[in-house]
C-alpha cells in the first residue's frame, strides 16, 4: 500500500522534466508563425483574467490589436495599467450590505433613507408622503429589531 501511494507522487515530477527538454526541441519564437504565438498567449491570458473583468477591458484590447505588433500591448499589460476598481462588478464578491452582523447591516442601511429627501425638489405633499414612508420603514425596522432581539434572548443555548 505504501509503495502504491509513493508511485503517484513520483509521476507528477516526471512531466516537468519533459517540459524542460521541450523548449530546446521547439524552434525559437522568432521562427514560429504569429498564429501559433497568439494561440499560446490566448491560453495563458484566459487563465490570467477572470471572465467578469473582460467586458471592461474589451475596448482597450481592441485598440491594442489594431496597432502594429511592435506597439501592441499584451492583455496583461493592459490589465495592470488600469486603476483598481472601487467596487467589484456585479456577481463578484459579496454585496456590501450582506457583510457583518445584523446591527452593522442595519446601521449601514440607514443613510440611504436619511438622504432620500434632501437631494430632491419636492412639493409639500410629496415631502409629507416621503416622510410618512420613511417613518413606516423606521417602524418596520424597529419591529424587526425587537423580534430579532427576542428570538436571540429566548433561545435555550447561545448562538
UniProtKB/Swiss-Prot annotation:
InterPro entries: TF_A-like/BEX (IPR021156). Residues 1-120 are annotated as: Disordered. Residues 17-34, 64-80, 95-119 have a biased composition (Basic and acidic residues). It is found in: Nucleus. It holds the Pfam family BEX. Its main location: nucleus. One of its GO terms (cellular component) is nucleus. Residues 37-54 have a biased composition (Acidic residues). Keywords: Nucleus, Transcription, Transcription regulation. Coiled coil: none annotated. The keyword Thylakoid does not apply. Belongs to the TFS-II family. TFA subfamily. May be involved in transcriptional regulation. Modulates various viral and cellular promoters in a promoter context-dependent manner. Does not bind DNA directly. This is Transcription elongation factor A protein-like 1. It comes from Bos taurus (Bovine). The lineage of its organism: Eukaryota, Metazoa, Chordata, Craniata, Vertebrata.
